[in-house]
UniProtKB/Swiss-Prot annotation:
Similarity section: Belongs to the UPF0114 family.
Full protein name: UPF0114 protein Tola_1474
Transmembrane segment boundaries: 15-35, 53-73, 109-129, 136-156
Taxonomy, superkingdom: Bacteria
Native source species: Tolumonas auensis (strain DSM 9187 / NBRC 110442 / TA 4)
Length: 167
């Protein structure tokens, strides 16, 4: 009975496979939104103010950072929790594949979230005349929370690595 339960639990990891595959659809949706913004820029670029152009470009950077985050979570999550990707014979294999454990992935995700939040905060600061002061304070507080959380996770990870390594 115990062996059956253990095999069933181990096989349950495959439930995550369609979720990681679904992230590729989210990536496709993000790509469509990205190019929608690019095409929109070219239709109004002559009449657009410089600040508006910069805000749209920051949105494009934001989209690309989120896309990179999706790729990282999709591949690393699949490799860490479902199965190894058999890509040894591919010339274009990503150099970090197979090297990110769950802890490293967590730290990279946290760093990506801080970068995304930074871009969003920069957009807020460039558009302060249209945003209420209390909302700006909340955006800043949330960003500081992300930064502190990422720092704390990185520091704890370092402490654990130092504890596990021989001196």
């Amino acid at each position: 009975m115990e062996r059956f339960i253990e095999r069933l639990m181990y096989s349950a990891r495959w439930i995550m496979a369609p979720i990681y595959l679904g992230l590729s659809l989210a990536l496709l949706a993000l790509g469509i939104k990205f190019f929608q913004e690019v095409f929109h820029i070219f239709t109004v670029i002559i009449s657009m103010k410089e600040v508006e152009l910069i805000l749209i470009i920051l949105s494009l950077i934001d989209i690309s950072l989120v896309g990179g985050l999706i790729v990282m979570v999709m591949y690393s999550g699949y490799e860490n929790f479902v199965s190894r990707l058999d890509l040894d014979d591919h010339d274009d294999k990503l150099s970090w594949l197979g090297k990110l454990d769950a802890g490293s992935l967590k730290n990279k995700v946290a760093a990506s979230i801080v970068a995304i939040s930074s871009i969003h905060l920069l957009k807020v600061f460039m558009n302060t005349e249209n945003i209420a002061d209390d909302k700006i304070k909340w955006y800043l507080l949330i960003h500081i929370t992300f930064v502190m959380s990422a720092f704390a996770m990185g520091y704890l990870d370092k402490l654990l690595r130092d504890k596990d390594s021989p001196h």
